[in-house]
Amino acid sequence: MEREKEQFRKLFIGGLSFQTTEESLRNYYEQWGKLTDCVVMRDPASKRSRGFGFVTFSSMAEVDAAMAARPHSIDGRVVEPKRAVAREESGKPGAHVTVKKLFVGGIKEDTEEHHLRDYFAEYGKIDTIEIITDRQSGKKRGFGFVTFDDHDPVDKIVLQKYHTINGHNAEVRKALSRQEMQEVQSSRSGRGGNFGFGDSRGGGGNFGPGPGSNFRGGSDGYGSGRGFGDGYNGYGGGPGGGNFGGSPGYGGGRGGYGGGGPGYGNQGGGYGGGYDNYGGGNYGSGNYNDFGNYNQQPSNYGPMKSGNFGGSRNMGGPYGGGNYGPGGSGGSGGYGGRSRY
């Protein structure tokens, strides 16, 4: 039987103890299935652990079983597992942010709430479903939101961009509240704010004492300032500070999530604002615009404007340069500084 694509079978494991080895990581995760790969990312010079790694299972069902059994504790430390994001996706808005709310585009007039509930219930426990309608006409605007009780269903759903719901092709994205979008924007500058693990000035520890105490840190930091693991089979970050916390913060100086500007439901904002033509009235280049523009809605939620999310400039070899998981590229900031799981 042909295996599912690797991107559906791989987990990023953050917050590892520096004492955790590949053997102890493997031993822990093998309780949920057979691993085809397991790695603790290390500094190439000192060979010291960078505090994160990846495990790849033989099936997505095993990943689901592992994620259903959270929290995970390895070598006396609670770790943070997340479904890994492939390199080609990691530069897109929303790739690494952790949210419980899902944006669903391409909703047709004959699609009702129960269609969304029936489809998405298999992924996890649904809290709320909202299909956005026009205030005057009552017609559906072509999009809606599904909120789960956990971030993992959203992470799993967006691994596959298109879903067929009620016979129609729908596109899914992570949704951010306006406040979350503003936090991400403020963190782009690499200063101030309190988005996630702390001050982006960094300099000292990882998860612990030391100036900054963020994912970036100095030589002991969550990535040692060299980039998110220098890549891992196309799933990492390139060298140069764009790691789990390059000082520019969430997405770096080149845009960050949304690249600034108004958000979804703000005047002139719109979903994407140039990213795949969202917000310009053409959801997916005109495919989903039956009900007009997606922008200027009263909703406070939605993925934001364009810009990059961590960058995607570095390519490189198997262990040298992709953009996998919470990781940026070449100093553009990557996942860290103030990221949140």
Curated annotation (Swiss-Prot):
The modification Phosphoserine is found at S17, S73, S137, S177, S189, S200, S213, S219, S224, S247, S312, S329, S332. The keyword Secreted applies. One of its GO terms (molecular function) is miRNA binding. Residues 190-211, 308-341 have a biased composition (Gly residues). The modification Phosphotyrosine is found at Y319, Y335. The modification Phosphothreonine is found at T128, T147, T164. CDD domains: RRM1_hnRNPA2B1, RRM2_hnRNPA2B1. The keyword Transmembrane does not apply. Its main location: nucleus. Residues 181-341 are annotated as: Disordered. Sumoylated in exosomes, promoting miRNAs-binding. The modification Omega-N-methylarginine is found at R26, R191, R201, R216, R226, R254, R313, R338. Residues 296-335 are annotated as: Nuclear targeting sequence. This is Heterogeneous nuclear ribonucleoproteins A2/B1. It comes from Saguinus oedipus. The lineage of its organism: Eukaryota, Metazoa, Chordata, Craniata, Vertebrata. The gene is HNRNPA2B1.
